[in-house]
């Protein structure tokens, strides 16, 4: 394979992995540990 194709596939796979981890953190089980700054702040 061409080195450019390998690089594009590697960068694409890393981007998909980071996006998947972000979605998992935002909406999966770890989201229970996230705090809402608007609820924590009292006027």
Swiss-Prot record:
Gene Ontology cellular component list: plasma membrane-derived thylakoid membrane
InterPro entries: PSII_PsbN
Transmembrane found in the keyword field: yes
Any matching Pfam family: PsbN
Locations listed in the record: Cellular thylakoid membrane
Record GO biological process: photosynthesis
Keywords: Membrane, Thylakoid, Transmembrane, Transmembrane helix
Main location: membrane
TM ranges: 4-24
Membrane topology category: Single-pass membrane protein
Described function: May play a role in photosystem I and II biogenesis.
Family membership noted in the UniProt record: Belongs to the PsbN family.
NCBIfam families recorded: PRK13183.1 (NF009650)
UniProt name for this protein: Protein PsbN
């Amino acid at each position: 394979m061409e080195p450019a194709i390998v690089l594009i596939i590697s960068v694409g796979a890393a981007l998909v992995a980071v996006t998947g981890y972000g979605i998992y953190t935002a909406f999966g089980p770890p989201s229970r540990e996230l705090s809402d700054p608007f609820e924590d702040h009292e006027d």
